[in-house]
Amino acid sequence: MMSTITGCLQEGVIERMKYTLDYQKYAELARRVAAEGSVLLRNEENTLPLRRGQRVSVFGRTQFEHYKSGTGSGGMVNAPYVTNIIDSLKEDGIIQVNEALEQVYREWLKEHPFDVGEGWAMEPWNQEEMPVDEELAVQAAGQSDAAIVVIGRTAGEDKDNSAAEGSYLLTALEEELLRNVCHAFEHTIVVLNVGNIIDMKWVDRYQPQAVLYIWQGGQEGGRACVDVLTGRVNPSGKLSDTIAEDIEDYPSTENFGDPVENFYTEDIYVGYRYFETFAKDKVKYPFGFGLSYTKFQTEILGFSVQGTAVTAIAKVTNVGGVSGRETVQLYLEAPQGKLGKPLRQLAAFAKTEELKPGETEELLLKTELTEYASYDDSGVTGHKSCYVLEEGDYIFYAGTDVRSAAEAGKATLTEPRVVRMVTEAMAPVQEFKRLKPFFFEEKDHAIANWEDVPLRTIDLADRILKERPTKSEYAGDRGWKLADVLDGKIALEQFLTQLSDEDLICMTRGEGMCSPKVTPGTAAAFGGVTEGLKRFGIPIACCSDGPSGIRMDCGTMAYALPNGTLLACTFDPELVEELYEMEGMELRKNKIDTLLGPGINIHRNPLNGRNFEYFSEDPYLTGTMAAAQLTGMGKYGVTGTIKHFACNNQEFKRHDANSIVSERALREIYLRGFEIAVKQGGAYSIMSTYGPVNGLWTAGNYDLLTTILRKEWGYQGIVMTDWWAKMNEEGEPGSGRQTIPMVRAQNDIYMVVADAASNSAGDNTAEGLADGRLTRAQLTRNAENICGFLLRSVAMERLLDREEEECTELHNPISTEGAGDSGQVLARLELPEPKLLEDIELPLEKLSTKKGTSAVYQLRFPKIGRYELVFRMSSTLGELAQLPISVFLNNTLQQTVTLNGTEGQILERVVTLPIRQDGEKYMKLYFGESGIDMHRMFLRYAGQNDIESFRNE
């Protein structure tokens, strides 16, 4: 355990919390996680681990430029350092690096620097590779015992992968590199520094002796990789996705990437559910597969069924020569019945501690049969809109991957059993067909059959009208504060009667990005964002991206953590929970109430750009890992916002592409991970997606956010939109102004607007209240959800000064001042005696707006007062691009402004600079993302105001 916590929550007061944020232990834990999530796919001739003193040549430019994460909001963590592979190998000292080859690369890199791209979603998937001809490969082989080839890839938000060279496929130069190195060396190790799986046909072509996926391991990823290569850590990661022979073998590929409609014709047969049922011969590496440097023997000691509770006991023995860990996986084969089922579903898993040679451990694998009831969306079982266990044998298989799992036992039902009765929700309205298995008796796999997908039969508008609350009276200000609710003096319902309609409307708006009301550089502020709301003692909560660590666009640094795919490959929720305890401490230290993560969308297709953020193709593994993160963060009073609810399985045209999917597939696959996170992880903050599902944008989808989430699952928490999302009335196009369906659906907060009080985004909530499309009671219901979140947040304690907290920091490499490098002084200007609102131009000749750069202006201010720094700028990027600029005076952050992509239109942004003392100041600009074209920048004097109060600010 890496922290000491004392204190308790009593009568709404945290008496004292003491904790130690030891950054060295944080790094050690992140490094361990990154190593344990690495997956060894091939290890011929015991090529790995490398032996002490071995001479090794390292190829591939990514050895120098480690990908810590993917791109976009999930990857924009300002890490204090990122370890790479080559330096970590030399730091480790176990093997001898071919320094002559290293120098060849370093000289080449001087002429071929890292290409950061043109800005948001414009980063290249890969970097240009140094050509390696036969002569260089043979020369290096003569000086070495083994070769390591490092291949790197990235992708991310707004930028899917592509079934093209340099993305899912290798480039011609990478093919040449592998061909020449594998031919010249007796032992070649390929290391894949990638966010998600890539095409693996090259393994057959070049036959490298070892292949290791290290994913994107955060800032400690380089060291973690070396730990595995040298055997300090025995790899124990297991694939969280199936690797097929070809991208076309995935059933979703046919419909992936359409800009308008994406039909989920594969239905519930995603990943291994499809391959184990229909196409076993198309699998190159099965789900759950991963090698070790040792060997294990697994046997089932016991299997029992009591009611619907299923228990298996597995005995694992290390029969090899080195210490290691093993994961036992329990799979279910349900009877086909009338609905049709996949031949395998992951039902449970457990991982051993580190076992020395000869040691044994017994693992307990438990599950509930009811968790794997099938949803009948057609009524074919006689139980429409019910979760049903059909009669027959439920056979369980145990093993170390889905393909090798052997029968462990079975449960038999002699008649169908209805597990849960619900109500039809989110059924599609467009006709299409879905996959269903058909079996010949003599075959162990199905052939594809197709059936019509059941369409919606309920009147959604009528449901919304009948269920809408109508009673909510305005009582005026009674003098109550939200603290009175916390202390049990009044009910929350009473408290909310004081809020005017305008107050309630304002509470539905989050402010950002980079609101000055909360931690600098974060994603949004929400809650008491107006003076009217603050008057009632409503605190302002802070949220920040994201799944790979804390993003603060002002340049403040934070720990960059291993990506979601890697975390899932550990198959170790306890270890992930421990890591996210540390993340919880870091969030609390930075006064951030919720992290915008984990991302828990399903890996429907390997080409989704944000797969690096997400966990797996399997919903049970996904939900289990999400619950572990939430539990870890929750130990420090903070939480995560699980996202994107739901079906964010494609980045291309994600704002508008309609996901058309059956109700059964939604419930069994795409919503299931969220359900586990809510019920087992205690989630109380959720983010909806950008796009529509079955014609309704999720940000205003009543059946998603009320019928299923709140009524069926019993969810008590907030829902927020994704940033600048659209909503719609059924049959109408989506619009960011259309907040009426958002409020009606209990999506509580629109993210984000510049100013909640003035309705700067021009939403139509007030219009809907005036004409009866909304009721005050609906707004009150949303306010109750928001206040419920705030009442359990540390933001509430901060507002009341009840948070007595003692944080000790050890071994801190992180600068809290932010803004990257110190920056180049571009100009030294003595400003003229200012005239009110007169423009004072700042030169742009040497200004660089590339990601991570800083620019400094040395300015002499002749008088105190308020000055306005005005940017006139544009970007050719799309409207969802996020391009932050942070402005510092004498290294003190003044404000961070965010420009969205303008598609070439010139816009103006203004930052107020309070000059409390005349004289010389250093004004620094920090650009957090590339893509801004600066057309003009100037200062103007805005007056002194009340000088005495101004001096005391």
Give the role of each language-model region:
Residues L413-E415:
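Interdomain boundary/hinge segments at the C-termini of tandem beta-sandwich modules
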Residues R872:
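N-terminal beta1-alpha1-beta2 submodule of the flavodoxin-like/Rossmannoid cofactor-binding fold
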